[in-house]
Amino acid sequence: MSPAPTQPDFDELIERRGTVCNKWDDMGKVFGLTAPDALAMWVADMDFRAPAPVRAALEQIVASGVYGYPGENRAYLDAIRWWMETRHGWAVAPEAILSVHGLVNGTALAVDAYTAPGDAVVLMTPVYHAFARVVKAAGRRVTELPLAQVDGQYALDWAGWEGRLTGAERMLILCSPHNPGGRVWSADELREIAAFCRARDLILVSDEIHHDLVLPGSPRHTVTALAAPEIADRLVTLTAATKGFNLAGAHLGNAIIPDAGLRARYAARMGALGISPGLFGPPMVAAAYSPEGAAWIDALVAYLAENARVFDAGIAAIPGARSMKLQATYLSWVDFSGTGIDAEGLRARVEGGARIAANHGESFGTGGAQHLRFNIATPRARVAEAVARLQQAFADLQ
C-alpha cells in the first residue's frame, strides 16, 4: 500500500533571490528596488514548490545523465487530453495539439500565421500586456475595445464598442479567464464573442492559461471551444500547465487547433522557426496532469482564495482603493483612482514607500490607468506583510 501523498506546504517561505529568478532578482533593474526586504508581486509565477510528482519526473531525467534530442512524448499528449477531458469536459483529438514555447510564443505564432503587416488585432482592454507587445512587434496594429464595469467586475460592452472597428481587423485575442481582472467569462458571453468574430471574419485566439486557477465559489470556467463549437474553423485555444503548476521555466504550452486547415497554417510557422518541445518540459507536464496534480491544484486554489480574502480586506481599509473581485487567477487588480493620486504618485508610495514591485496598470491598455496588479501567489505571511506596508504607505489618507 503506497503512502498517502504529502500535503503541499504553501506557507513555506522559499528564498528565490540569487536563483536567476526574474521575479525576485530583476526588481532592481526594473523598479529600482534593491532593498533586501523588497517584495516581488509583479511577474505571474508563484512562490510555491511544484507538486512532488513533477519534481520526481525532473529528477529522473537529470539522473540519466543524457540530455540529447527528445522524440515525440506520447505520455505528454495523453496527459493533456486526459486533463482537458476530466477537468474541463473537453475531448481533444491528439492531432489537434501543437506544442509551443509558452503562450506568449503561441500568441505570436498565431499573429504571424493569420494576419499580415498592417492588419489590426482586437484586444478587450485592460488586458494582459504581452498581447499588445506581440502584436505591435509583428508590425500589426491594436484595436482596443475597452471593457465596461458592472457590479465591480469587467463586462462586455457591445453598445459602447459600436463603430470602433476600422475594417483592418483580422483577429481577436481573448484572455479567458481574464487577466488582470480575474473574471471568469460565462458560456453566454463566450458565444457572443464567437458570434462577433464570425460576423466580422476574425480569427479568435483564446488564451486560457489561467483556466485551472478558478477560485472556490466562483463560476465554472467554460472552454471557448465548448461554448461555441460553431467557431471551430476559426478558433485557436492556448493552454498550458505552466501557470497552474508553477512551471513557467519549462517554456511549454499548447496550441489546440481542431480545424486541419487552420492548424496547417500554424504548424507551418512553427516549422519555419524550428519550434518543438525540449527534453524537460513534457515529462513535467505529464506528471502534473495527473490525479495527484488535480489534488494539488484543488489545495492551491483554496489557499489562493484565502490569500485573496486577506489581501482584499487590507486594500479595503485604504480610502479610495478597491480590489476587483477575484474569480480566477492569483492576480489582484487594484483600482487606486478613488485616492486621487496619479500613476507617478502611486509608484512613489508602493515602490518607494512600501518597497513592493507590482505591475503598472497603464501597460494593460485603456482602463488600466491608476491601477496596479499584485501577484498574491505567495505564502500568506508575505501577503499580510504587503497589506501592512500598503496601509502604511497610504496612511495619510485616513
Region locations from a protein language model:
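N-terminal small-domain helix-loop-helix segment of the aminotransferase-like
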Residues: 4-102, 109, 291, 397-398
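Conserved core segment of the aminotransferase class I/II
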Residues: 56, 228-305, 312-313, 394
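Conserved core of the PLP fold type I
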Residues: 67-195, 212-213, 217-230, 236
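Helix C-cap/helix->beta junction micro-motif
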Residues: 138, 199-200, 354, 397
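PLP-dependent enzyme catalytic core of the Aspartate aminotransferase-like
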Residues: 162, 340, 349-358, 363-398
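Conserved glycine-rich beta-strand-loop-beta hairpin in the small C-terminal domain of fold type I
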Residues: 286, 302-312, 323-336, 368
